[in-house]
């Protein structure tokens, strides 16, 4: 998985050289943000169920037809609601992984690849997940640098879906 740190090391190593001052400064910047990123990841983990439940409810409120349409991709039955919560949880989990590594690698490798095809195959609307992620972003309860770090990856996921 690519991160700014592993990319800098791979670049320097492929050229048979030590890390440059610029690369070291970039790596240092990541370490300075790491505490806030880990704080955000821990908070999102600890509040995951509340955030997922609230995000699913936000989707049902904004798109009430998803609770009225029959079929496995809609939330008219408990199994559909469980799938919706599972999918929202997947986006939230990828966000915490990105926070831990300090880069979008987890989303790029595990989420983005095939996302459009999955949504099309299962008739899933990206707008549902955008609403869910906006809800999480607006209610995660983080502040300061921890909020900035979390919002960076939530915004990244929202932009992927847009």
Swiss-Prot record:
Binding residues for (2R,3E)-phycocyanobilin: 84
A GO CC term attached to the entry: phycobilisome
Example GO biological process: photosynthesis
Keywords, ordered alphabetically: Antenna complex, Bile pigment, Chloroplast, Chromophore, Electron transport, Membrane, Photosynthesis, Phycobilisome, Plastid, Thylakoid, Transport
InterPro entries for the chain: Globin-like_sf (IPR009050), Phycobilisome_asu/bsu (IPR012128), Phycobilisome_asu/bsu_sf (IPR038719), Phycocyanin_a (IPR006246)
PTM per Swiss-Prot/TrEMBL: Contains one covalently linked phycocyanobilin chromophore.
Gene3D superfamilies recorded: Phycocyanins
Matching CDD domains: PC-PEC_alpha (cd14770)
Localization per record: Plastid, Chloroplast thylakoid membrane
Transmembrane segments: none
Topology in membrane: Peripheral membrane protein
Stretches of the chain forming a coiled coil according to its record: none
SUPFAM superfamilies tied to this protein: Globin-like
Highest taxon in the source lineage: Eukaryota
Family: Belongs to the phycobiliprotein family.
Function field: Light-harvesting photosynthetic bile pigment-protein from the phycobiliprotein complex (phycobilisome, PBS). Phycocyanin is the major phycobiliprotein in the PBS rod.
Quaternary context: Heterodimer of an alpha and a beta subunit, which further assembles into trimers and the trimers into hexamers. The basic functional unit of phycobiliproteins is a ring-shaped hexamer formed from two back-to-back trimers contacting via the alpha chain subunits. The trimers are composed of alpha/beta subunit heterodimers arranged around a three-fold axis of symmetry. The phycoerythrins also contain a gamma subunit which is located in the center of the hexamer.
Descriptive protein name: C-phycocyanin alpha subunit
Native organism taxonomy: Eukaryota, Rhodophyta, Florideophyceae, Rhodymeniophycidae, Ceramiales
């Amino acid at each position: 998985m690519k991160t700014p740190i592993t990319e800098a090391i791979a670049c320097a190593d492929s050229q048979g050289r030590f890390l440059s001052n610029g690369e070291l400064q970039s790596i240092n910047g990541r370490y300075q943000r790491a505490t806030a990123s880990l704080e955000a990841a821990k908070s999102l983990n600890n509040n995951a169920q509340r955030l997922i439940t609230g995000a699913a409810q936000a989707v049902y409120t904004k798109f009430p037809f998803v609770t009225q349409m029959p079929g496995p991709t809609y939330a008219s039955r408990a199994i559909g609601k469980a799938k919706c919560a599972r999918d929202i949880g997947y986006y939230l989990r990828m966000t915490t992984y990105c926070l831990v590594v300090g880069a979008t690698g987890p989303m790029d490798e595990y989420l983005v690849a095939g996302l459009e095809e999955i949504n099309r195959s299962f008739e899933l609307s990206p707008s549902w997940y955008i609403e869910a992620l906006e809800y999480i972003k607006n209610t995660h309860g983080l502040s300061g640098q921890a909020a900035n770090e979390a919002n960076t990856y939530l915004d990244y996921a929202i932009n992927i879906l847009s």
